[in-house]
Amino acid sequence: PSSEIKELVSSIEFKDDAKKVFFASNPQIENKDSFASKCINRAEKTAVLGCYKDSEIHVLDVKDPQLNGIKEVTAAHEFLHAIWARMDDNTRKDLGKKLTEEYERIKTPKFEELMKNYKETEPEEIENELHSLIGTQEVEISADLEKHYAKFFNNRKKIANFYKQYNSKFTKLENEIENLNNQLPNLKKEIDDKTAQYNSQLEQLDKDILNFNQRANNGSFNSQQQFDRERHQLALRKNKIDSYNKEINESIDRFNVMRQRLLDISIQNEKLYDSITTNLKTSNKI
């Protein structure tokens, strides 16, 4: 095995017998072109990070340091497919029941969406996929399943925590993108509404100032007190409108900052997905 494979094995912490199965599966860490030629053979809806094909394990060589641990999780996931392939039907049936029960207990909308994709593309492999997904992505699982996975890994939770760490990078960016996409249209509408109101108030103020000046020039005021009073009222309105304009400009500045942030993190998100994607840039799947 290559030095990189040996490092991967050391990091995953296989049990001795499991290590033999892993090496027997001829594990390979491959660049995008090589990986795609072996693992991408249909229209995928998710990013494929690894595959177990023709009794061999293939892992995409993801180099982004933000995603440290992703190769370990992928290799462990595909290794569990190799284990599943070696099980007899009775063992699979018994384990499949436990896996399905565990899935029903721990499923999230995102997990359900992932399994829906598997049901569309590989309906006969649902329990096989649950075996790999639960074993490598869920930190807390049933005692029965933990005992099962303990046959292969010295520290299964370490692998699940690798997944949790790198997946949080995607989740954090996606949540912020979603929040900004929700906030920006509302803020824009608020700015547009306030701007329309400001323009209307300013137009009326300009008319009233023009009228005031005409009356002053024509000597239409009955007293200095009336002149001063109306002039003071116009000044108060102008100050209020100026404050309103300042508030609008502050909202515009906030909008521009948020829009730039959305652009920046969208680029970050795109780069992250590009590092794990050989076909489509969507949610990650292993």
Residues of each region from the PLM?
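Short, solvent-exposed loop/turn and secondary-structure capping segments
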Residues: A85-M87, L95
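Extended alpha-helical coiled-coil "stalk/arm" regions
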Residues: K194-D228
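Short, charged, amphipathic alpha-helical segments
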Residues: K97, Q225-H232
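C-terminal amphipathic alpha-helix
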Residues: R237-I286
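Glycine-rich, often proline-containing surface loops adjacent to acidic residues and nearby aromatics
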Residues: S55-H58, L80
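Short pre-active-site segment immediately N-terminal to the catalytic Zn-binding motif
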Residues: H58-T74
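Metalloprotease/metallohydrolase-associated module, dominated by Zn2+-dependent proteases
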Residues: S2-D54, R92-E203, N213, L234, ...
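Active-site recognition of the HExxH zinc-binding catalytic motif
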Residues: V73-A85
